[in-house]
Amino acid sequence: MRHRVCATLIEEQQILMVELHTPSRTFWTLPGGGVESGETKEQAVIREVLEETHLHVTIERQLYEILIDQGIETCFLVQRTSGSSSAPRLGIDPELPFDQQELRTVRFRPLKDLQDDPQIARLLTLL
């Protein structure tokens, strides 16, 4: 069973999100990805945020763990490490060739504009 992690980073009423473009659709989601062999969920979420956004984060707490179509998803509330004040920059997925990258954009998006997003709505009930 595949285990996926995601990160919730909120600053000034905005949430960090990445835009993905897959062969079937384009959508916004939280930074995250799969847990690699020998890696903890916590290590995976820190690595995924760094790969996708170039931000260094620490974990505050686990927000949820749910069953999804592809396996299990665990989401963590994270914060930037002290001294990490740079803006997020688009990273890469090292598992995909350069010409097949799915990451398109990374930025903070206003929470008030995302009330209808099911993933964000779930998070807001847990914060």
Question: Locations of the language-model features?
Answer:
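Conserved hydrophobic "DFG−1" position in protein kinase catalytic cores
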Residues: 9-10, 17, 78, 108
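A conserved beta-turn-beta hairpin within the catalytic core of GNAT-like acetyltransferases
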Residues: 23-26
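Conserved N-terminal beta-strand and adjoining loop/helix that marks the start
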Residues: 1-16, 37
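Short loop/turn segments immediately following the C-termini of beta-strands
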Residues: 20
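C-terminal/domain-terminus segments
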Residues: 124-127
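A short gly/proline-enriched turn/hairpin at secondary-structure junctions
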Residues: 29-30
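Unchanged
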Residues: 35-58, 67-119
